[in-house]
Amino acid sequence: MNLEHMGKAAQEAAFELATVATAQKNQALAIIADELEANKDAILAANAKDINAARESGMTDALIDRLLLNEERLTGIANDVRNVISLNDPVGAELDSRVLENGMRLSRRRVPLGVVGVIYEARPNVTIDIAALCLKTGNASILRGGRETFHSNVELVKVIQVALKKADLPAASVQYIEKPDRELVSQLLRLDQYVDMIIPRGGAGLHKMCKENSTIPVIIGGFGISHIYVDHSADISRSIDVVENAKAQRPSACNALDTLLVSEKVAETFLPRLAERLNKSNVEFVADDAAYSFLEGKAATLRHAADGDFDTEWLSFTLGVKVVADVAEAIAHMRKHNASHSDAILTNDIQSAERFVNAAGSAAVYVNASTRFTDGAQFGLGAEVAVSTQKLHARGPMGLEELTSYKWVGQADYLVRP
């Protein structure tokens, strides 16, 4: 597999995609959605191979859930693609304009980034999400999925290629690196002659490797410890509902709750009641000394927190718990322990809420809501290519607009500079 050739082909495809009409791009997306449903048997059979291999390797149930496709999820993926069709095409839109003193009309116009390289682990839906968003925005994409979803991704890319052909778009608009060789990842990270952006989706190790080895701009995202702080003024019963949703709905998601911080003024009341609720989901509590004293005899599974536990993105039914004095200590803890993704405060105190929102350094900050809302579809952006936790170019769920840049367009009447 020659990545140099893939990069060159992707760049040529990107040049063509930049001028393709929205209707033609939407046609390709509609075909992708239809083909997903028409080929569900082949896709699910391929996914079953990946699931069996994951089980044989000893992968946890929570992580296997990331790999799993079923008929309901496949229909959901197809509908997500159809939702992208309904979204406005940002390409060509004017951000702003003005007329200069010399008569030139100067504007900023949205344009595609060009070629986007995406390296991701697990989650076969990412293959479709990225392809759909890149096509809608006129970007070519080079995808490299994890070996754990190899068979699923190969089938999904077949669907995409069928759609590209039927819509008369370049086959190189979406390319997939089939070989799981890590050296190919290193080569992709150095294709700066052809690739304009790298987006890694996976654990901290993948992000670190991309950041340290890429000669291409990298969007860092997905990894981060998600926190909820339960303030002294919070509604206890409703807070338990939110914490349960954030932790137990889908613990393998990157926006699932990792660490719960509880005001010392309500910890004695709140934590035993929370344990009673989360015991039903077999949640393991990893607690500091103060939290342990309130959970002992209440939590079905409980252990003392050790070094590194509050720096762990659990991706499972494990929850770190710490008792803090107030919102200031909660914020200090979050800053120390990589709070960059999604964080929330549960409170009925406006001042506490404002202090938390202003001080939290996360890409998404919530007041009285679950961290599980950090998602492109939930934000009304359609699907997402990633959740960026950095501050430059894009932040939070990356939808269509985040896959564009802009160019300056000057229009005049044969104007020359004096």
UniProtKB/Swiss-Prot annotation:
Entry GO CC = cytoplasm
Q: What is its EC number?
A: 1.2.1.41
Pathway the protein takes part in: Amino-acid biosynthesis; L-proline biosynthesis; L-glutamate 5-semialdehyde from L-glutamate: step 2/2
Taxonomically, which superkingdom? Bacteria
Swiss-Prot/TrEMBL keywords = Amino-acid biosynthesis, Cytoplasm, NADP, Oxidoreductase, Proline biosynthesis
- Localization annotation: Cytoplasm
Name the enzyme's class.
Answer: oxidoreductase
Major place of localization?
Answer: cytoplasm
Entry function: Catalyzes the NADPH-dependent reduction of L-glutamate 5-phosphate into L-glutamate 5-semialdehyde and phosphate. The product spontaneously undergoes cyclization to form 1-pyrroline-5-carboxylate.
Please report the name of this protein according to its UniProt entry. Answer: Gamma-glutamyl phosphate reductase
- Gene that this sequence comes from: proA
